[in-house]
Amino acid sequence: SSKRIMKTICICGGGALGLVVASVLSHTREVAVRVLTAHPQQWSKSIEAVDNTGKVYQGVLEKVSDRAEDIIPQSDIVLLCLPGFLIEQSLRQIAPYVTNQAVGSIVSSTGFFFQAHRILGGSASLFGFQRVPYVARVREYGHSADLLGYKQQLYMATENLSDDFEAKWVEWLQTPVAHLSNYLEASLSNSNPLLHPARLYGMWHDWKGETYKDQTLFYAQWDELSSEVYIAMDEEFQKLCCKVGVKIPSVLDYY
């Protein structure tokens, strides 16, 4: 049988999620993993993620660098594991070196597809997960992280990629990956992008400018007003989804 050509994946971003994904992927020995990070000197070539049953994903990185030109041209797939506010600058950093690589984001609800269309162009090969595959927390930066939770099912949108692209991720992440019909289904979210502002409004809408004695707990002290605002925001969101022809479960269905 013909020898399988190993894919090279570049992870952009060195936080908890980047480290966990890099550990899981390199642990499979199915892919070569490299990391583009602002702090390469703080990274070990040997990394690990530990889940809450004690299972350890140990991996060895092929390369760690802060220079896109040293790491992007030889990569087949580029995966951004970054908070939303860093995605645009990261896309601009890698853009000069992107030829036909697949470029994606570990979560798409912060505007990845909109920014990638603008910066990489309409013919770029793009993919994005709807939600993150893991809950992650750093143990030691650049060395180890805790994998605190798995998702049973992942959803991905792709553009200009072959039909078997999701199947590769099923193999690498050992999790089912379903195909979304277009990028808006991955980009429009009534999860955190609505949940957080609704709760913040509930906490601060009547603030008088004084310093509080105690911290308000975000979830543990959740109140009726935050729920009412969240549900009202979702109703407006559902009207938008209906207009653009996108189906996303309502908050009341989902939670």
What does each model-identified segment do?
Residues 41-46, 111-115, 164:
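Short, charged/polar "capping" segments at the starts of alpha-helices
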Residues 60-74:
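Short acidic low-complexity segments
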Residues 233-255:
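Small-residue-rich helix-loop
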Residues 4-56:
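NAD(P)+-binding Rossmann beta1-loop-alpha1 motif at the extreme N-terminus of oxidoreductases
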Residues 77-80, 84-142:
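Rossmann-like NAD(P)(H) cofactor-binding subdomain of soluble oxidoreductases
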